[in-house]
Every structure is written in C-alpha cells, then in structure tokens.
Regions:
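N-terminal regulatory/effector-sensing and dimerization cores
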Residues: 2-97
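Short, solvent-exposed positions on alpha-helices
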Residues: 43, 131-136
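Short glycine/proline- and charge-enriched loop/turn segments
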Residues: 67, 100-101, 155-157
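Aromatic/histidine-rich interaction motifs
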Residues: 89-118
Length: 188
C-alpha cells in the first residue's frame, strides 16, 4: 500500500511469517483462520479478529483454515509508543481512568473492538489514493488506536505501550498535565 505502516499479508502455505518490526502492530485476519503461538499460549483468530503485538508478541503463526479461494489474508497496521501516548494525552481524564482501571462497560468495549475492524477496512479503501492516504490515513490510524484503547484489551494495551506496571500512573500524570499546562508543549 502507499501507507508505510500498513502491510497486507497473503499466504498459500500453512506457515506464515509474522511482521518483522520493532513497532507495535495489530494483525487483523481478513480471510481464513490463524493460530498464533505467543509467550502466553496458543490463540486462534478467525476472519475479523485481531491480535495486538504489544500485548502478546506472536512467535509463529500457522494457518488452520484458508478461505474459499484457498488463501489466507491478513493486514497489519503498525504504530509506535508516541502515537499512543499522544492520543492518551488528548483523552478525557475520566475515560483514561476507566481504561486504566478496566472499568469500561462491556457494551463500549464490544463496540470499540468492532470499530477497529471497520477502521482498518476504511484504511485499506483509501490506501491506493495518495492524496486521501496522506491525510485520512493519519486520522484513521489515530481512530484505530483510540478504539484499541477503549476495547477489551485497552488496559493491557496501554500498559504495554507505555511500559508502566501501574497504568494509574498515566492517569495521574495526564490529569496533572491537563490541570497545570494550558498551552501547547512537546515531550521528548
């Protein structure tokens, strides 16, 4: 694609290569069924489901079932910690508190998990149009990160990205920054 952080993975063989990157990524199954071997165990993913590498970095993958067209297709979308932290700093402090405390409603988490898939689909739809990809791609990727944070794995995702044992520290830091700094600033 024209978006450097989006990759399409197709495989006709049973074994698949996971993305070789230091960046965090989601790996969304588009066609087929996948089994991932991670440090936490074995996990299966069907079409429309995704894995978050920052939570459980897959070691290997194996195709359990191919689509009717006898292929396996997945999409990976990469992001770095600064992408996620920037979004965390922009979020409402109450929302960050609910994410950090694992207190999102089931309905909100289910909706957000579904929105991740829809947002990735939209990203693919614009990926071949350089004008749309440059502007909209950036915003859709932010949308994906937002929905990952609000989804069922939001707390683990946030903790793994910022590498803190207690995600409450982020909530407190974000609250302090919002209360004490009204102007723009950068974090190095």
């Amino acid at each position: 694609t024209s978006l450097p952080y989006v990759n399409i993975h197709c495989s006709l063989t049973q074994n698949i290569e996971m993305p070789q990157t230091d960046a965090a990524y989601i790996y969304l199954v588009v066609e087929g069924t996948l089994r991932l071997y991670t440090p936490a165990g074995i996990m299966d993913y069907e079409s429309g489901q995704y894995s978050i590498s920052a939570i459980d970095t897959p070691e290997t993958g194996y195709i359990l079932a191919k689509s009717d067209s006898q292929r396996f297709v997945a999409v990976s979308v990469e992001f770095n910690p600064s992408d996620v932290i920037t979004i965390l700093l922009e979020l409402d402090k109450d929302l960050i508190g609910r994410i950090a405390g694992g207190q999102q409603s089931e309905q909100m988490m289910d909706m957000s998990d579904g929105e991740v898939t829809r947002s990735v689909t939209r990203l693919l739809e614009i990926a071949d149009d350089p004008v749309k990809a440059e502007f909209l791609g950036r915003n859709i990727r932010r949308e994906i990160i937002f929905h990952l944070l609000c989804g069922k794995s939001g707390t683990e995702f946030m903790e793994s990205i910022i590498r803190l044992q207690n995600s409450g520290d982020i909530y407190e830091a974000n609250t302090w920054i919002k209360e004490n700094y009204k102007g723009a600033f950068t974090v190095e």
